Each structure stands twice: as C-alpha cells, then as structure tokens.
Curated annotation (Swiss-Prot):
The gene is metAA. One of its GO terms (cellular component) is cytoplasm. Keywords: Acyltransferase, Amino-acid biosynthesis, Cytoplasm, Methionine biosynthesis, Transferase. CDD domains: GATase1_HTS. This is Homoserine O-acetyltransferase.
Amino acid sequence: MPIKIPDTLPAFETLVHEGVRVMTETAAIRQDIRPLQIGLLNLMPNKIKTEIQMARLVGASPLQVELSLIRIGGHRAKNTPEEHLLSFYQTWEEVRHRKFDGFIITGAPIELLDYEDVTYWNEMQQIFEWTQTNVHSTLNVCWGAMAAIYHFHGVPKYELKEKAFGVYRHRNLSPSSIYLNGFSDDFQVPVSRWTEVRRADIEKHPELEILMESDEMGVCLAHEKAGNRLYMFNHVEYDSTSLADEYFRDVNSGVPIKLPHDYFPHNDPELAPLNRWRSHAHLFFGNWINEIYQTTPYDPQAIGKLAA
C-alpha cells in the first residue's frame, strides 16, 4: 500500500517521480482499511527536504500510511515558506489530542546548545511525555534521539573536537532484532553531528539495548523495549547529496569544514557521491513500520493504554 499525503505537498511529485507509490486522499477514502497514523515532528530548518526524505522511506512500506506533518508551535522556521507551513503543518498543540501508531522526531541544528537553553525545550519535554500515552512507537533521530535519551534516562551528550561527518562502517550487534531484519553484519551509515552519546552511559541503563555501532563513530542505534522507543543517532534517511549540500554550504559560508569521510569518490568533491546506504535505510524503516503494524491496537484509542 502507498503513503497518503496531501496531493499538493511538494513531496508528492518528487516521490511519484522516484517510483514511490503515493495515494491521493480521494483514493484512500475508497479503501476500507485503517491506515497507520504516522506523525513527523519536523525540527529541521529546511522542512521540505526532510519531509521528502522521511516520506520516501515511510512510503516504501507495503502498508497504507497516513503521514501528518507537525511543527513546534512557537518556533519560526527560517528556510521554509510560511505558506507551506500554514498549508501542510499543524502545531503539536493542535494534534496532542490524537493517537499515533508511529511518531518520528527529527534532528535539529542546535546540538551545541545545552538542552535547557533550547528555546522550545519545555515543549519538547511535554512532547516526550505525551508520546508515552499517545504514541505506540517513537523513532527519535539525531538531536531528537539525544534529547529523548537525555529526557528519559539522563544520558548526556558530549561535544566532539571536530564534526563527525561522512559515511562510516557500522556493525549489526543484534541480528535477531526485529528492527535489523535483513541487515548485513557490516553496513554504511551517513553521520553528521557535533556531539555524541557514549556506550558507557547507555550501558548504565539495562532497559536500553545498543543495536548498531561504529568503531569510529560509536553508538548509532539503541532500542528501549519498555517504552517502545528507538534512538537513531545518525542519518540513514539522508539523500545521496545531503552531505555534499552541507559541505558546500559551509565552504561557501567560510566555515572550516573537512571533506566528509569516505563519501566523494577519490575524495574529489567535483565527483558525484554514490549512495551506499539506501537499501539499509529502506530495510530499517520497513522493519519499523511492519513492527508497528504487527503490534499496534486496531482501535487507536487503545494506544498508550496497553503500556500503562
């Protein structure tokens, strides 16, 4: 089954062109099934690009998914037209009465700030608490993952001496995990962050299981079974050119930046990078969506009650 998104959302045409099955709202009404309700709390400045990345992966599932775009209420996005936000987004306050089968919390370019110094930290704390009663499964990504694991477990983040930036080899630490079904023992993941969480701090919490790790970049993915939460500290959702876009943005702005590790062919930024993580990104999101489908209550109003 395809993903259901508004017909006029910019991601619609992009995904159709890529071969992702996208369903119009009119066609969705004709299908007598309950689509999975997935919320995307988009904290990134360029929201349209992030919408496409996430919708591409969520929409590749054989299940019908309805994606709701959500933003922080009091925060203005600098790189997304206000008209786009008004047309396609709701604030969290506007959806907090709803139940979601799955909920994605993205990263944000604020990782060098202390959590308490983030202008919308109070709302983030409320959202984290709300997910425990209104969301069946939460996928936290990059800064969203660091913030969530700090909120729920007090796991700190540490500033790196230089930006972790590039494509790095990772190991599958739990081949039997439902979220890593079909994964190779060794695979590659894009990394782009100024901070990290550390294995030693996570291991203090037996309820957390580390599923993916890199010898160079540390922990990539952790799972919390009791809270039905995933913490993805890197960027499997990235496009082929995402790291290049970040690199050239910094170069053009005069910001010191090294070439992304193992990304450009022959370390030549004039050559187009090859995407070596796409298949595992689809596997990961497909496994997550499938597990939601297998375990979420048919009655959305029962979400949160089973874990209570």
